[in-house]
Amino acid sequence: MCGFIVSLGLDLNQNDFKNALNHLSRRGPDSEGIWSENKIFLGSRRLAIFDLNDRSNQPMQSLCSRYILVFNGSIYNYKSLRKHLIDNDVKLKTYSDTEVILELFALEGPQMVSKLKGMFAFVIWDCKKKEAFAARDPYGIKPLFIGTNSKGIILASQVKTLLLTKQISTERDINSQFSFWNLGYIIEPRTWFKNIKALKSGYYVRIKDGKIISEMQWYDLSKNWISADKNKQRISKKECNKIIKNSLTSSVKKHLVSDVPIGIFLSSGVDSTLVAGIVSSNTKKKIIAITVSFENFEGSENDESIKAKKIAQKYGMEHHIYRVTQKDFQNDLPEILEAMDQPTIDGVNVWYASKAAA
């Protein structure tokens, strides 16, 4: 994952901007970059996945110099989109998905988002029109938050990053608190703070003169359900299994595109076991499997590492078990809470699995 922050029209000094950007270092340890012009700041922390060369660092400027991009995510069909650009005489300088997004936008404008297959959040600054374009993937896998005050707008990958700019009010949203205490998480687009909202999944916005001038839903997941409801047909269990298997296999195969080693979080549950099986059948690369095991459950039926070890052996994966003691948890709790951008009852297992992978 990467992280970015974009300030549009606020009285933000460069030191406060850099301090906020540094907060994103855990999201992007490989490089840092800043582009600025008058009261416009774009900052990025990169985790390199495709084209590990410095030429793919961000913020990235388009070939025509008109557009500046910061981006978090992965575009799994970027190679076919790259070919499309080359076929249109675009002289690309990198092999990254970042440049593909940037030049596709320069070529086709906002409608290009419908061609992207993957998880993403990005902001593009148009130096000619003096406006920003921000978009988020259909499922909201990658975060994008928008903070506002009377003078302008700041966008960032994390809520805490926005607060560190000292430009956004910390007044809390009572409805968000109600959501957390009842559900264990906050329902988007709300956040814990009144003046910070998430960009909705499958939406894009245009921002000019410190204000959102248009908001568009470019992908509506509910239409998939409506389509399925209209086209009801009885199928056998065997046919159903085949459809699910083909769809899952197709999705997992798309995720195997990478210029860095591939790993899997293996919990021994049905879902991660299925993914492990599909991965092992569709790549010759060495796959690393990581399982988190808690000391209190060791040796019991709740110890997932026992089954996970057998699954990893079955699929020929290099297996790493990360054991967590009660003392480990007590020591790590402050860092876990710091990494937790919004209140939630979930995420501890993923935090430890990510720590093991790092």
Q: What spans do the regions from the language model cover?
A:
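Cysteine-centered catalytic environments shared across enzyme families
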Residues: 1-341, 350, 354
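Catalytic subdomain that performs nucleotidyl-dependent activation
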Residues: 345-346
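Active-site nucleotide-sugar/metal-binding loop of Leloir-type enzymes
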Residues: 356-358
